[in-house]
Curated annotation (Swiss-Prot):
GO (cellular component) term, any one: cytosol
Compartments, record wording: Cytoplasm
UniProt xrefs under Pfam families: EFG_C, EFG_III, EFG_IV, GTP_EFTU, GTP_EFTU_D2
Protein name: Elongation factor 2
Species this protein is from: Pyrobaculum islandicum (strain DSM 4184 / JCM 9189 / GEO3)
Lineage: Archaea, Thermoproteota, Thermoprotei, Thermoproteales, Thermoproteaceae
PROSITE patterns referenced in this protein's UniProt entry, alphabetically: G_TR_2 (PS51722)
GO-annotated molecular function: GTP binding; GTPase activity; translation elongation factor activity
Amino acid sequence: MSSAVRIVEKQLDEILAIARNPAQIRNAGTLAHVDHGKTTTTDSLLMGAGLLSPKVAGKALAMDYVPIEQLRQMTVKAANISLYFEYGGKPYLINFVDTPGHVDFTGHVTRSLRVMDGGLVVVDAVEGVMTQTETVVRQALEEYVRPVLFINKIDRLIKELRLSPQEIQQRILTIVKDFNALIEMFAPPEFKDKWKIDPGKGQMAMGSALHKWGITIPMAQKAGIKFSNIIDAYEKGYVDQLAQEFPLYKTLLSMIIEHVPPPNVAQKYRIPRLWRGDLNSEVGKALLEADPNGPTVIAVSKVNKDPHAGLIVTGRVFSGTIREGDEIYIIGRKMKKKVLQTYIYMGPSRIIVPYMPAGNIVALMGVDEARAGDTLVDPRISDIPPFEKMRYIAEPVVTVAIEPKNPAELAKLVEALKDLVIEDPTLDLKIDQETGQILLSGVGTLHLEIATWLLKERSKTEFTVSPPLIRFRETVRERSQVWEGKSPNKHNRLYFYVEPLDETTIELIATKEITEDQDPRERAKILREKAGWDTDEARGIWAIDDRYFNVIVDKTSGIQYLREIRDYIVQGFRWATEAGPLAQEPIRGVKVVLVDAVVHEDPAHRGPAQIMPATKNAIFAAMLSAKPTVLEPLLRLDIKVAPDYIGAVTSVLNKHRGKILDMTQQEYMAYLRAELPVLESFTISDELRAAAAGKIFWSMQFSRWAPVPESMLLDLVKQLRKKKGLKEEIPKPTDFVEVY
């Protein structure tokens, strides 16, 4: 098999000819921890495809096409590109996605994985497998995306750490071992062994994206190259020769073509995981085969605002062929739209194509109402189930208030904000209808910094941004008594109690194992077997709040007119969970149970304006009598530091309510895993750097929600209430319901 990958400039008709043959398509992308060199690696591939000049590759950061990314040298959005290659005498089309590595942008990674079958995981040879590597590999494996490994920055082992050939070899083996441990931990059972990296089979490459060379073990054996030769190349100044003999793009593309499955193979095992429909139906069979002649089914992975073309929807065609002029149905939004134009991506530029068959990534104009995670289908099969919802690992926990300097520009600002939230569903926008206050929440301070920068660029308005505030959650610690909620007209009475929702059920909601729209019997069976629910209670679930993890259950029997007001009760429940009774923070992990009701016979007396407040007030009263508390977001820190500084680093963490979970020592580094409240994290970076005299790497990511220490609870609730202009004293159940 020839390892030559000939790269030639190809006309569109040739690209379309390959696009029709799934065996010659690969859908892959880069995944990595921040600063491990993903984008520089991708640039090297573009250079190989003749899309960047060799001088510029590695400096151009071509896929970082939002200007702030070039400024901060960091990928913020996931970018797409289609590359043409010849390998082993055959032409291939590689649809490539570059994804962000910074923890604040894991939402973009989640959306990219849906369209990929393979992930090129880039790991820094010095830092090794880090938190974010673990997060993206776990996300990839959850989406049944096969990982291959590129160990980057080998030059640092030679120039900075001055390691010997044996030490370099040992370092690489350690990284492969750590990487395979992640696969053992997170891979689907049937792929645990198959997907582990075997360097001898060419499933791992090593090299330097900066110096544009890369090599696999089989290539090195064939060419008789040893680590000592690579060290020589750096010490004697002939690294360029290394890049000529083993250009990185050839090595990585050969690896992708050989070890990432084509769509018609990958879809056989990915579709049963991503789609809950009947696999023996016409649609099911077409999806499993990636059949270009089957009914059209597209999974949307991202939506971008284009100043000239409106919203551009990008997704993967899993079955059928999409053409300009086709009508398409958006499942879940229950609407038909006409595709005005179809494109493929070449970096930031879109190239118009007449059609795109199954197995490829396509961009569409004209489907403005579609959002990331939606399923687009041929209108004739509009009743099929959509693809599984996407699971975002990080939650928006930091908020800023945004205010236009000129009130006349408010509408313009809000319009631009709404577009931002369409593009990035991990942003959360709240506009207070009464006060006009705009609150934007993101995964971290950096996420918000970039969102507000984009907002300024696009809205062309001047606005102020408040210092960041932490988002909290409200919950309960025990079961309440039953409380009566009365409608304002006194004609309807609803009786509820609340209790904590168990962690297993929260996890089932988070992993989408139970959803609001699945068959109630199937859902009840899962809850009974996995979370120990009572059958009747599990069947009585009316709604699942998968944003904040709450459920409402109907335990009544034989109540007249209850069915007519069910939707209003559910709306009242959702209204309550948005902002709880303690401090108007969202409610998390609460089971709301309806046990009785008296409903007026006349529909005019039992409308939403009567039922929704009765529901909300009873839930609030019940919560306040169930040992309510506030949950704060915690971050997980992974720290690598020189052993001499462990004491200093530990004391910084202790000062900020941090807790060390684990500590190990290897070679010349100590590894600490710790948890730290987000509330305490704003100055931690500078303090850690100072404590370890700069000799420290660390990364942070959202870990979990945990109750605020009892000693802080009262003061925190008062502070939150004061900030929101509420009276400081904590409300009592009787502030929401009448007690006789």
